[in-house]
């Protein structure tokens, strides 16, 4: 049976729909950076998703080819994630989606090295006749965070974020969004197949102890 990161690491991917504090260890991702409204057809964000899955499935299916990854085991591709920010803005202003910057990403299993990633980019480029040069190997050490499961429209996330920030302050923490620590979303539902009222998204914000 394929290893499923969502089920094996429920604390990261399946939190309760009430806020909690969690320490996130460093993980490696495949990632694509971009800017613009995530809802724009053929925009940078939607294009980034296609690039990510092209590499993710090349790595996932590598065991069927000649490139052997040391320590490989069969697994379910982890969910799509996104780091989001806007210039000169603490958090996100959902009314200014065109100003959003993002790092779209998918977690890599620990056994995938940078060399394996580089092989996958070359292999996908050759087989799919597509440019994957925007995809990068991205280690991210997220650290201490407050997180919560948000159920419903992405545009309603501010309500969940307010709950997270109230919980954070009540427990002696403050927000620590910086140039290297971001508003983080993990997408557990496919918006093309799920009613908007039932979308499940993990929302995560970096924090630090209040001095």
Report the location of each language-model feature.
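A solvent-exposed interaction/effector surface
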Residues: 1-211
């Amino acid at each position: 049976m394929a290893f499923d990161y969502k089920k094996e690491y429920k604390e990261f991917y399946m939190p309760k729909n009430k806020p909690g504090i969690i320490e996130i260890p460093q993980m490696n991702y495949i990632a694509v950076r971009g800017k613009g409204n995530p809802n724009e057809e053929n925009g940078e964000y939607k294009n980034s998703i296609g690039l990510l899955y092209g590499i993710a499935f090349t790595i996932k299916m590598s065991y069927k080819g000649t490139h052997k990854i040391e320590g490989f085991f069969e697994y379910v591709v982890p969910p799509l994630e996104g780091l989001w920010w806007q210039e000169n803005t603490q958090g996100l202003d959902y009314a200014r989606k065109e100003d959003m910057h993002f790092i779209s990403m998918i977690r890599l299993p620990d056994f995938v090295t940078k060399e394996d990633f580089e092989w996958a980019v070359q292999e996908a480029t050759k087989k799919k006749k597509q440019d994957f040069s925007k995809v990068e190997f991205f280690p991210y050490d997220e650290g201490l965070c407050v997180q919560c499961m948000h159920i419903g429209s992405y545009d309603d996330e501010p309500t969940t974020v307010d709950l997270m920030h109230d919980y954070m302050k009540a427990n002696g923490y403050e927000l620590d969004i910086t140039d290297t620590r971001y508003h983080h979303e993990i997408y557990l539902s496919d918006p093309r197949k799920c009613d908007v009222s039932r979308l499940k998204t993990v929302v995560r914000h970096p924090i630090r102890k209040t001095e």
